[in-house]
């Protein structure tokens, strides 16, 4: 039975009963409790049911709600999926990773969910997803909630060394031979504090961002350990980055 078929049957159960438990879904569909909870989570995120403790409730009207689960709507979605998959393969069991905000970041977090790695993030949609999926080790960086970016930002001068990771994965609005550019200054400044305490900095940007310069310079090219991007990225820019010691992976 496919996921789509399971979802259809689950919604039909709710239409008849109004409420179903995880145990009832397991019994009806012949699936594991983890799969049942995952199906309920996905249908909740898409507004087709309401997730409640130990089950789900029917809703009379679907909620028009955008969440990171609607990533198929993101620009260059397929390329970002490939980038996220490639990035996840860099991390070894037992390591810790810092993942920042954005659609590619969420895709990466989804790829790593369930693996024996510690995920450090200030991106609340990703943190909520990891908690819902019962990922073993999640650290949420503290600070003031920034509604526009759905992240937490720590006060100026606060100590971030507690959040040092083996890897830091980040993206931006543009990448040139000079380095990575970000447009949100507060977010960029908060992330910059961590550059000196992470093991390796990996930039994840789709090919449309290569050669673009927008906002503030977040990190110089010589601070970047690796770039993962699409196959259509500007080859001239990639050569200039390689000359400065940046490892390039095109997917």
From Swiss-Prot:
Source organism per UniProt: Escherichia coli (strain K12)
Keywords: Cytoplasm, DNA-binding, Repressor, Transcription, Transcription regulation
Alphabetical GO biological process terms: DNA-templated transcription; negative regulation of DNA-templated transcription; regulation of DNA-templated transcription
InterPro entries in the record: Carb_Metab_HTH_regulators, DeoR-like_C, DeoR_HTH, NagB/RpiA_transferase-like, Tscrpt_reg_HTH_DeoR_CS, Tscrpt_reg_HTH_UlaR, WH-like_DNA-bd_sf, WH_DNA-bd_sf
Domain HTH deoR-type: 3-58
DNA-binding region, residue intervals: 20-39
Listed GO MF terms: cis-regulatory region sequence-specific DNA binding; L-ascorbic acid binding; ligand-modulated transcription factor activity
Gene3D superfamilies: Winged helix-like DNA-binding domain superfamily/Winged helix DNA-binding domain
Job description of the protein: Represses ulaG and the ulaABCDEF operon. Two ulaR binding sites have been identified in each promoter. Full activity requires simultaneous interaction of UlaR with both divergent promoters and seems to be dependent on repressor-mediated DNA loop formation, which is helped by the action of integration host factor.
Superkingdom assignment: Bacteria
Protein name: HTH-type transcriptional regulator UlaR
Pfam families: DeoRC (PF00455), HTH_DeoR (PF08220)
Reported phenotype of the disruption mutant: Cells lacking this gene show a more rapid utilization of L-ascorbate and are able to grow on L-ascorbate under microaerophilic conditions.
One cellular component (GO) term of this entry: cytoplasm
Coiled coil spans: none
Subcellular locations according to the entry: Cytoplasm
């Amino acid at each position: 039975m496919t996921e789509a078929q399971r979802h259809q049957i689950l919604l039909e159960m709710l239409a008849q009963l109004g409420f179903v438990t995880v145990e009832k879904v397991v019994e009806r569909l012949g699936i594991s409790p983890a799969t049942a909870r995952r199906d309920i989570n996905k249908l909740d995120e898409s507004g087709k049911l309401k997730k409640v403790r130990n089950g789900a409730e029917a809703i009379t009207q679907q909620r028009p709600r955008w969440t990171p689960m609607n990533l198929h709507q993101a620009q260059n979605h397929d390329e970002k999926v490939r980038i996220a998959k490639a990035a996840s393969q860099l991390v070894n069991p037992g390591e810790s990773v810092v993942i920042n905000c954005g659609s590619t970041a969420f895709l990466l977090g989804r790829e790593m969910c369930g693996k024996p790695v510690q995920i450090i993030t200030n991106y609340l949609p990703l943190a909520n997803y990891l908690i819902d999926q019962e990922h073993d080790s999640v650290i949420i960086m503290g600070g003031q909630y920034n509604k526009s970016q759905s992240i937490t930002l720590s006060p100026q001068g606060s100590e971030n060394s507690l959040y040092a990771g083996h890897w830091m994965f980040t993206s931006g609005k543009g990448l040139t031979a000079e380095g990575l550019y970000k447009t949100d200054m507060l977010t960029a400044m908060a992330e910059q504090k961590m550059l000196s305490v992470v093991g390796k900095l990996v930039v994840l940007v789709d090919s449309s961002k290569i050669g673009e310069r927008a906002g503030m310079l977040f990190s110089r090219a010589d601070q970047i350990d690796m770039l993962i991007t699409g196959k259509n990225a500007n080859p001239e820019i990639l050569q200039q980055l390689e000359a400065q010691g940046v490892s390039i992976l095109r997917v």
